[in-house]
């Protein structure tokens, strides 16, 4: 099972599409490692610098419709090779969300109010997250501030995550 704890990267924008996650010019790459330096290089977000801001982060928190656009598995791969196995947002493009779980990663939806509260409380701080998959809760920490946030994923998605992805899950069952 992959790791879902660590430092949080807040991306305060909706509709971050797969071309911004990993530009189309890199889709001929067959090595995940080759995608590593290209993650979010085309993201248009004031003050964001992928070279400075991605390193050491394990989780992204964004707004709505994350992963919209082309249905490419390269987007989760580029996140994964950079150590980002969890994206939290108000909503996700359906295929992107499923690709995340198929890769043993998580795309977790929280209410717009909860996302807004996380941005207000934690976006300007060095925030850490702990994920309890069994109890389905996140624990956010920044300095002395701490907040627990429940989440829900289906039992099937939880099994995909625990197995490491769709291929590993299928291998264990068939």
Regions found by a protein language model. Name each.
Residues 1-4, 32, 124, 144:
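A generic structural signal for short, non-catalytic loop/turn and secondary-structure boundary residues
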Residues 28-135:
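Feature captures the catalytic cores and cofactor-binding loops of soluble hydro-lyases/lyases
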Residues 104-174:
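Acidic, glycine-rich flexible loop/linker segments
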Residues 12, 17-18, 22-23, 31, ...:
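Glycine-rich, flexible loop/turn motifs
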Residues 16, 67-73, 161-170:
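Conserved phosphate/anionic-ligand binding catalytic regions in large, soluble enzymes, centered on
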